[in-house]
Amino acid sequence: MAIRVYKPTTAGRRNASVSDFSELTRSTPEKSLVRKKSKTGGRNSYGRITSRHRGGGHKRQYRLIDFKRWDKDGVPAKVAEIEYDPNRSARIALLHFADGEKRYIIAPKGIKQGDVIETGAQADIKPGNNLPLKNIPTGTVVHAIELRPLGGAKIARSAGAAVQLVAKDGAYAQLRMPSGEIRNVDARCRATVGEVGNEDHANIQLGKAGRARWIGHRPITRGESMNPVDHPHGGRTRGGKPPVSPWGKGEVRTRRPKKASNKMIVRRRPSGKNRK
């Protein structure tokens, strides 16, 4: 993937950039793997805002992605197409399996049309192949990792994401997350070899507010600039209280200190200026 930078013909085009989409091989999705996706505008079933700053945006269709893959052990698949997915930052790859079935997966870096991908404990260690962590050599970079055996991929699914398998200790594998955290995961959990493609996605500059609206992002207004009736931070009186949401919920360090999964964390992610 490469980034195309616009010439500054207008204020909105100055410094704006876009993907050149050169890796894509098809512009329309596989019809059998597409479902309707309704917009919520950040509202729940009562019509109340539960997720702020969402709404509008271009219409989308949801592409069904195979995050499990374990039911295709031993069945090779050919990469038929590399496609755009409006619902995620990564590209997706359309696989044609030897048994005739078609499925989408997240497209790993370096994968191309015509490549053959395998699933199962005996699969080779090459980008796109999916196998248990216990069968992957230490030091390998992986993505689309399960947190529980057969639970489906949960970790490292966005563009450019990569996790390194740093050690194996009995029934657990130690993973170094993109945040720097080192975490134990059941060695029976599956992962896909390689890193997620479209790694230059983080370098794209929207350039204008309108492009943010196209993807469904609404403006953010600081609570401090509101009136007291609209937000706890509103009004001219400053300081004296910790930052909160418009409904008075704490907005800083909201992770539960006794979370059950804490015992799986070997080393917490670096904080503050030590973060990379």
From Swiss-Prot:
GO cellular component assignments: large ribosomal subunit
Keyword RNA-binding: yes
GO molecular function terms attached to this record: rRNA binding; structural constituent of ribosome; transferase activity
Keywords per UniProt: Ribonucleoprotein, Ribosomal protein, RNA-binding, rRNA-binding
Task performed by this protein: One of the primary rRNA binding proteins. Required for association of the 30S and 50S subunits to form the 70S ribosome, for tRNA binding and peptide bond formation. It has been suggested to have peptidyltransferase activity; this is somewhat controversial. Makes several contacts with the 16S rRNA in the 70S ribosome.
Subunit structure: Part of the 50S ribosomal subunit. Forms a bridge to the 30S subunit in the 70S ribosome.
Listed name of the protein: Large ribosomal subunit protein uL2
Gene: rplB
